């Protein structure tokens, strides 16, 4: 299965599809909400 390139918006349902990690700006507590609203993007593996 293809993985999503860095810079692609990642959501709860597909954050594991990033080639690297799904990176969210405001840390772990806000993460579920940020994924919901589309604030997270695929980036290099953490």
Swiss-Prot record:
User: Can the keyword Phosphoprotein be found in this entry's annotation?
Assistant: no
The cross-references to Pfam families, in alphabetical order and at most eight, read: Toxin_28
Region: Keys region for toxin activity; residue ranges are 31-33
The protein's location, in the record's own words, is: Secreted
Q: In which tissues is it expressed?
A: Expressed by the venom gland.
Gene Ontology MF term list: toxin activity
One GO cellular component this record assigns the protein to is:
extracellular region
Principal location: secreted
| Function according to Swiss-Prot or TrEMBL | Insecticidal toxin. It inhibits insect voltage-gated sodium channels (Nav) by partially blocking the channel pore in DUM neurons from the American cockroach, not by acting as a gating modifier. The inhibition is only partially reversible after prolonged washout. In vivo, the toxin causes flaccid paralysis followed by death when injected into Heliothis virescens larvae. It also causes uncoordinated movements followed by full paralysis to sheep blowflies (Lucilia cuprina).
Tell me what this protein is called. Mu-segestritoxin-Sf1h
Keywords from the named record: Disulfide bond, Knottin, Secreted, Toxin
The Swiss-Prot or TrEMBL note on domains reads: The presence of a 'disulfide through disulfide knot' structurally defines this protein as a knottin.
S-S pairs = 3-19, 10-22, 18-42, 24-40
Q: What family does the entry list?
A: Belongs to the neurotoxin 16 (SFI) family.
């Amino acid at each position: 299965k293809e993985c999503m390139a860095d810079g692609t918006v990642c959501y709860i349902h597909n954050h594991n599809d990033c080639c690297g990690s799904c990176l969210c700006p405001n840390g772990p507590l806000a993460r579920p909400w940020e994924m919901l609203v589309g604030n997270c993007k695929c980036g290099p593996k953490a």
